[in-house]
């Protein structure tokens, strides 16, 4: 049986996750199980993962700090930017143009910045919205 108190290899690491659906939250869940602090940023309407059912949402969010922010507003983007400035890892699942609109273009190029895990539906066409129903994080 998994016991979180025995898995602390990522203690002291902060993960900011604003990826939606399954792969991003699942990746964040794995990092949290290894001791990382996970901050999940959701839209004010909640994570679309909730449409899969409450048990699924709760399983993917267990142990995470949940913050709601409207990333389409200046205030929400400022809140996210502040979280990212303190993060060691950032998990996203948005198109490059959306990152640019949020002022986060080049997130992976920041000197001494966080590790950026970007989960996209199609690496050949990253601007095309999409989601692969198969999770490759296992």
Language-model features, listed with the residues they occupy:
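N-terminal helix-loop segment corresponding to the beta1-alpha1 unit
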Residues: 1-136
């Amino acid at each position: 049986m998994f016991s979180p108190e025995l898995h602390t290899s990522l203690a002291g690491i902060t993960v900011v996750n604003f990826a939606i659906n399954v792969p991003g939250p699942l990746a964040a869940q794995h990092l949290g199980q290894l001791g990382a602090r996970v901050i999940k940023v959701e839209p004010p309407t909640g994570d679309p993962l909730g449409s899969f059912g409450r048990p699924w949402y709760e399983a993917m969010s267990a142990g995470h700090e949940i913050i709601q922010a409207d990333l389409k507003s200046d205030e929400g983007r400022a809140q996210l930017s502040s979280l990212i400035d303190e993060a060691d890892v950032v998990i996203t699942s948005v198109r490059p143009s959306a990152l640019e609109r949020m002022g986060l273009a080049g997130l992976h190029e920041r000197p001494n910045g966080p590790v950026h895990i970007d989960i996209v539906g199609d690496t050949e066409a990253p601007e095309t919205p999409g989601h692969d129903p198969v999770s490759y994080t296992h």
